[in-house]
């Protein structure tokens, strides 16, 4: 029995020593996995009522949220965790016994002011009447995501609003930090995972990571950081997207076959084999050299063999890589990207027509016309057309009104 307990102690110690994280930045816009399609608005101001509030607004000093259960099995740094709480300063911790919430003033990670077992978007602040932390679970077992969303939050020391989330993913035990919506121009944050006071995994640029999302309330402009448990593989090309145009003119063939790839490995990628097939046909493979894709960055890979379609029509294009740096790809299931392209004989360029209705009896119309004219003057000539109609209202209407406009 003593020998079994000793062996168990050794195994658990090995798990603890080997547990770690690495992170990859997203290179395409949107939410991780596409499960959360909700719009990003304040609580009570457009946010779906399916979210549950876990904090109170108006936190002039940092406060903790309520303690919440994770709705599925989840490991942090190799050990099971079941509950969490969140500070209004942007820190989620699995150490629910932590007493003092982190300061609104961000710092470098690791930091003695951050509890062990924490995920940080440090530099957020919740003093406003709309600054509320909410939670929601998306998807179905065993691939659910639990979102903790800082809705309509402040960036400490800035007069602006910003929206961020921390996401826990079932089965993979991945943690995502999602940059969702932002009006800040000078705010920055300390983003990362703190295991303890001596160990942290941070996003490059911390504690001064700037938001990348715009004011768009949809996920279309979202950006995220993916924290992955375990050791980073040495060679791992991750397919982002095929970058061939959606529509191709047959007479312009042959076409370069290109795709964007993220280097998810620890080694810089200097060579690889590029492959593509059309409509599931015979693969076209060729070696690509002269690459220089640093770890955590993206680049476009161009296949040495161009494609000449046989005729107009719709084609399914599959592009994948293999043999990065002359070695086996350590994670081959993320190498492939697909796209449908349409080959046509010609393309007609269409210019939008803008119709404007105005009148000399309309007070706001004069400044609006001035603004509109200035805006149109910034556009490229020939890219648009507009027509202005003089109207019979309000009041007696414009003296230049004609019945054709009515």
Listing of model-derived features with the role each one plays in the protein:
Residues 1-22, 230-233, 258:
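Bacterial Sec-dependent N-terminal signal peptides
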Residues 19-236:
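Extracytoplasmic Ser/Thr/Pro-rich, glycosylation-prone low-complexity segments
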Residues 20, 79, 174, 267, ...:
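Residue-level signal for well-ordered, solvent-exposed loop/turn and beta-edge residues enriched
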Residues 95-98, 159-160, 365-369, 375, ...:
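Short, solvent-exposed loop/turn and secondary-structure capping segments
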Residues 149-153, 179-181, 355-360, 389-393:
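Active-site-proximal beta-strand/loop segments in catalytic clefts of secreted hydrolases
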Residues 231-350:
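Extracellular/luminal regions of secreted and cell-surface proteins that mediate adhesion/ECM remodeling
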Residues 346-389:
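Local sequence-structure signature of Cys/Sec-based thiol-disulfide redox active-site neighborhoods
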Residues 380-405:
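Thiol-based oxidoreductase modules, predominantly thioredoxin-like and allied folds used
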């Amino acid at each position: 029995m003593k020998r079994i307990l000793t062996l168990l102690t050794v195994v658990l110690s090995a798990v603890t020593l080997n547990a770690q994280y690495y992170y990859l930045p997203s290179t395409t816009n949107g939410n991780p996995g596409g499960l959360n399609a909700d719009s990003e608005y304040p609580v009570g101001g457009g946010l779906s009522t399916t979210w549950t509030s876990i904090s109170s607004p108006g936190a002039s000093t940092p406060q903790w949220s309520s303690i919440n259960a994770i709705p599925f099995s989840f490991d942090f740094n190799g050990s099971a965790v079941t509950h969490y709480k969140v500070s209004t300063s942007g820190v989620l911790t699995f150490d629910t016994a932590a007493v003092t919430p982190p300061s609104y003033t961000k710092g470098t990670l690791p930091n003695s002011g951050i509890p062990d077992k924490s995920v940080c978007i440090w530099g957020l602040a919740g003093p406003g009447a709309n600054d509320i932390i909410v939670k929601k679970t998306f998807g179905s077992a065993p691939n659910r995501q639990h979102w903790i969303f800082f809705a309509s939050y402040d960036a400490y020391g800035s007069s602006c609003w910003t929206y961020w989330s921390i996401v826990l993913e079932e089965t993979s035990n991945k943690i995502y930090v999602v940059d969702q919506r932002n009006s800040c121009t000078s705010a920055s944050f300390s983003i990362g995972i703190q295991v303890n006071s001596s160990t942290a995994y941070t996003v490059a640029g911390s504690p001064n990571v700037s938001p990348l999302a715009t004011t768009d309330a949809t996920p279309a402009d979202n950006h995220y950081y993916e924290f992955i448990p375990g050791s980073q593989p040495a060679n791992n090309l991750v397919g982002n997207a095929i970058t061939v145009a959606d529509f191709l003119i047959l007479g312009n063939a042959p076409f370069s076959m290109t795709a964007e790839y993220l280097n998810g490995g620890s080694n810089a990628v200097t060579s690889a084999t590029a492959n593509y097939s059309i409509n599931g046909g015979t693969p076209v493979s060729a070696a690509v050299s002269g690459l220089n894709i640093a770890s955590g960055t993206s680049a476009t890979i161009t296949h040495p063999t161009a494609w000449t379609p046989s005729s107009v029509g719709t084609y399914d294009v599959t592009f994948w890589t293999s043999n990065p740096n002359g070695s086996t790809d350590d994670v081959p299931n993320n190498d492939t990207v697909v796209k449908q392209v349409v080959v046509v004989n010609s393309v007609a360029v269409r210019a939008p027509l803008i119709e404007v209705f105005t009148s000399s009896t309309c007070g706001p119309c004069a400044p609006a016309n001035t603004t509109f004219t200035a805006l149109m003057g910034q556009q490229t000539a020939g890219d648009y057309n507009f027509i202005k109609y003089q109207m019979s209202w309000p009041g007696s209407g414009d003296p230049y009104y004609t019945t054709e406009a009515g």
